[in-house]
Amino acid sequence: AFCNLRRCELSCRSLGLLGKCIGEECKCVPH
């Protein structure tokens, strides 16, 4: 599956984290 950066950012933001696409994976990382 292709990582959608916008969707990744939105889902991570709700956790108070920053969304990053690593390859095809969405990773939530601290700011």
From Swiss-Prot:
GO terms for cellular component: extracellular region. GO terms for molecular function: ion channel inhibitor activity; potassium channel regulator activity; toxin activity. The keyword Nucleotide-binding does not apply. Expressed by the venom gland. Residues 6-9 are annotated as: [R/K]XCQ motif. SUPFAM superfamilies: Scorpion toxin-like. Keywords: Amidation, Calcium-activated potassium channel impairing toxin, Disulfide bond, Ion channel impairing toxin, Neurotoxin, Potassium channel impairing toxin, Secreted, Toxin. InterPro entries: Scorpion_toxin-like_sf, Scorpion_toxinS_K_inh. The modification Histidine amide is found at residue 31. Disulfide bonds join 3-21, 8-26, 12-28. Has the structural arrangement of an alpha-helix connected to antiparallel beta-sheets by disulfide bonds (CS-alpha/beta). This is Potassium channel toxin alpha-KTx 5.5. It comes from Hottentotta tamulus.
